[in-house]
Swiss-Prot record:
Lineage: Bacteria, Bacillati, Bacillota, Clostridia, Lachnospirales
Transmembrane segments: 13-33, 50-70, 83-103, 107-127, 139-159, 166-186, 206-226, 228-248, 272-292, 301-321, 333-353, 359-379, 381-401, 406-426, 444-464
Gene: baiG
Superkingdom of origin organism: Bacteria
Protein name: Bile acid transporter
Similarity-based family: Belongs to the major facilitator superfamily.
Length: 477
């Protein structure tokens, strides 16, 4: 991999790190937004899935596009543009008055996120010496996960004291501060802007269409019906979009999706495992919040503290487990971290109506610790060998699959839990059980079923990890 000789690369990384801090901190603040909004609007809790997916669709699908744009316009311009869009989305979130309005606002927030994250990773790939990129990605993961440690707790406290709209205006103020910092601290360079004439616009449009539908399809199936017209139509459009996307990208001179980069084993295998396991974090975070809403409706803070513990675990996993893979075989380290992930999920089976913050925190904390280690290792492996010319599109492509794995988990596991609760409430109520008792029993039964399904996914993930090639030894040979 070629790197740029920059003696001030660590100092130059500071504003990019602050931008990453902004995204993760506000992500933590808004972890409690979905359930609060649907409760405020008086609509079903399963609508939290759509709020999460709206942001996830744009942040994932637009990542390779805006990463590619960074290769064309330059990092500084793209980063500042991303912060502006990110701030605008949060302003719209603060004034949202309906579900449709909120979905549009979160979609815009996701576009801003998609412009910021690939640029930060591209800086690491191109400016840091090759022998220090592992530590740099560990630092990036620490910033990304560590910042949201205080986010859910602070967000919950602000929301409890003043409401979710005030919480969002605090987020907007943070965006303004970070924009000013980045504007004055990132120096204009001699970067030569490339012409937009050869920009892969058809590929960009098809990427958004396919991957947005890819995220929505599981929710369509579970909420509307697997044999419904909407599900069949969405699946058909997605397949057609995928076929056309492959054809377009094969012919494009400068494709959004770099086929050579994606075809490597170092990319394919980690992505498959990410889809099986990494989505558990966001899904379980949402499900714990909803579980507490069902079983302890007057307790706003308990789930926020538990989520903060999860991000502490993720931060520790990224800096403790992740770097171990530089010395030991990655698949051995990954197996260990996935076992920890399984333990975290298994603890959900013990959730009860009167469970304390301790068991919620233990479950999410251990889960975060295991997944934090995985994420760091996968990032170092998948992004190896990128040249500076395609750093933006490469990191954006990886970011697409990394980011889409989490909301894909949300699209599968959150409706599975929420719809399970709804079905069980109806079943227990029809048997003569009082509504409150039926709701609590339904939530416990559904979380236990969900636990068994998630453990099955982790087992498959471990099997795939054991099939990984001896990655680092192979590179040394």
């Amino acid at each position: 991999m070629s790197t740029v000789a920059n003696p001030n690369y660590k100092k130059g990384f500071v504003p990019f790190a602050i931008a990453a801090l902004l995204v993760s901190l506000i992500g933590g603040f808004t972890a409690v937004l979905g359930p609060a909004f649907v409760a405020d609007q008086g609509i079903d809790y399963n609508n939290t899935t759509w709020i999460s997916l709206a942001l996830a669709m744009s942040s994932a699908a637009c990542a390779p596009i805006l990463g590619k744009l960074g290769d064309v316009l330059g990092r500084r311009t793209t980063l500042l543009l991303g912060i502006v869009i990110f701030a605008a989305g949060n302003v719209l979130t603060a004034v949202a008055t309906s579900l449709i309005f909120m979905l549009a606002a979160r979609f815009i927030v996701g576009i801003g996120t998609a412009a910021i994250s690939p640029i930060v990773m591209a800086y690491i790939v191109t400016e840091y010496p090759q022998e220090e990129t592992g530590k740099a990605f560990g630092l990036y993961m620490l910033i990304s996960s560590g910042a949201v440690v205080v986010g859910p707790t602070c967000g919950g406290l602000i929301m409890n004291a003043a409401g979710w709209r005030v919480m969002m205006w605090v987020c907007v103020a943070l965006c303004v501060v970070v924009f000013l910092i980045c504007t004055f601290s990132i120096k204009k360079t001699a970067f030569e802007k490339k012409s937009m004439a050869g920009f892969d616009k058809p590929g960009a449009a098809l990427v958004v269409v396919f991957f947005s539908l890819f995220l929505c399809i599981p929710s369509f199936g579970q909420n509307i019906g697997w044999s419904s017209t909407a599900f069949i139509a969405a699946a058909a459009v997605a397949l057609v979009a995928l076929f056309i996307l492959v054809m377009v990208e094969k012919k494009a001179k400068s494709p959004i999706m770099n086929g050579k980069f994606m075809a490597r084993k170092e990319f394919v295998l980690p992505v498959l495992i990410l889809f099986l396991t990494q989505g558990l974090m966001m899904a379980n975070m949402t499900n714990v919040i909803v579980f507490v809403r069902y079983t302890q409706p007057d307790n706003v803070i308990i789930s926020s503290f538990a989520i903060s513990i999860m991000y502490i675990g993720m931060s520790l996993g990224s800096v403790i487990i992740g770097p171990v893979a530089d010395k030991k075989e990655p698949k051995t380290v990954l197996t260990f971290s996935l076992v920890l992930t399984a333990i975290g999920c298994a603890l959900m089976y013990l959730f009860k109506a009167d469970s304390s913050v301790a068991i919620f925190a233990a479950s999410l904390g251990i889960l975060g610790f295991g997944l934090g280690g995985n994420a760091t290792i996968f990032m170092k492996v998948a992004l190896s060998g990128l040249s500076s010319e395609v750093a933006g599109s490469g990191t954006g492509t990886y970011g697409l699959f990394r980011d889409i794995s989490a909301p894909f988990g949300v699209a599968v596991f959150v409706p599975m839990f929420a719809n399970g609760v709804t079905a069980n409430i109806a079943k227990y109520a029809s048997g003569g059980m009082e509504e409150g008792a039926a709701t609590v029993k339904a939530a416990i039964s559904s979380i236990q079923t969900l636990t068994l399904v998630e453990l099955g996914c982790i087992v498959v993930g471990i099997i795939l990890v054991r099939m990984l090639p001896r990655i680092y030894q192979k590179k040394e040979a």
